[in-house]
Amino acid sequence: MRKKHRLPFPILFEDEDLIVVDKPAGLLTTHTKIVGRLARESQLTAENILNDYVRKGQAKSKKRVWLVHRLDRETSGVMMFAKSEEVAEKFRADWANLTEKTYRARVAGLLEEESGAFESHLLEDADGYRVRSVAAPDARRAPRGAKTPRLARTEWRRLSTADGTTLVEVKLKTGRKNQIRVHFSEAGHPVVGDEKYGGERASRLYLHALSLRFRHPRTGEWMEFTAPPPKGLT
């Protein structure tokens, strides 16, 4: 007998190729760096929850989902998973041309301009915990095996201001780790609640993946899904 699955987040769309969900803040997208398969599978992550969902309680089922992109643990909003490795690879190979992502963020301070953009090369620290902007890389001088800085572009538009903060709509032209958080922090306007990058403590990280627009890998149709923003980001 198959057990019923009550997911801790809503499914926004599902078909034979994809699952689109509204991930809550505080939930890992995928496992952290824990050694061993059993340890990875025991972690409470969106990936593991959806693996259990597609297997419908059948322990021997080989069905699973594939990671296409990530959201930080503290970030809520729209996420997409593939139901096959082939579909996942299609998106990974041409992510910038097949998708458009829009975020909402509340940042410290008052942004004077109505809109703007940040562009820099981002580099992860050796342990992968933090990210920072660095000079454009010179491949000829890079030590063998060293991490390579990757170009990142963040476009934003001011929506409103309140209590010494600014609500912004953000569009990513690239999808680098912690990209929005790093760019606004380095501009002197860290995301509210982002203690990792210099923001003041708050009830949550005020960053939300508002919408995801993508070209369906099978039909070629453009589709868009939205996750309602939480309190403080409306």
Sequence positions of predicted segments:
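RNA pseudouridine synthases
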Residues: M1-T234
